Amino acid sequence: MNDLNELKKYIQDVKDFPIKGIVFKDISPLLANGEIFRIVVEKMAEKVREVDVIIGPDARGFIFGAAVASYLKKPFVMIRKEGKLPHNTIKIDYKLEYGMGSLEIQKDLIKPGQSVAILDDVLATGGTTKASVELVKKLGAKVTKAVFLMELEFLNGKEKINAEVISLLKY
């Protein structure tokens, strides 16, 4: 696939979901097509070959992050909502559109000095990604890239992220 914009036909707009006034980008058709999903994994992998660790935020970041990490034979580390990870974790509180949220990561899975890439489905306001970057920084590592299937440019989330931002698709 030479033109990545062809991927857009596998992403459906769902009006008024999850609440009235929102147009949700449903990636289910893309994930349900093995060949198309493989193309996305390969394209994302091209962008992060040189990093040491790949992380993905709860929940759709797990899909892309784990697939790309496996493809590249690199470690994958989950970022989860508070209280969902065992063992020693560190936490960060961050602002959501409608309140506050908390994210956690396990302390021992990323080492100081490692380069890290965040992979996720969509870059919207940038709040989750910014918080994820801060969590990695607390561990002494550095997020060098944030790679997304799609970016909602009108929300300006890219401006909040202190790393190279790469989006396969832009809306």
UniProtKB/Swiss-Prot annotation:
Enzyme Commission code: 2.4.2.7
Coiled coil location: none
Keywords: Cytoplasm, Glycosyltransferase, Purine salvage, Transferase
Listed GO CC annotations: cytoplasm
Keyword Glycosyltransferase in annotation: yes
Database matches in SUPFAM superfamilies: PRTase-like
Pathway membership: Purine metabolism; AMP biosynthesis via salvage pathway; AMP from adenine: step 1/1
Subcellular location: Cytoplasm
UniProt superkingdom: Bacteria
GO molecular function ontology, one term from the record: adenine phosphoribosyltransferase activity
Family membership noted in the UniProt record: Belongs to the purine/pyrimidine phosphoribosyltransferase family.
Task of the protein: Catalyzes a salvage reaction resulting in the formation of AMP, that is energically less costly than de novo synthesis.
Protein known as: Adenine phosphoribosyltransferase
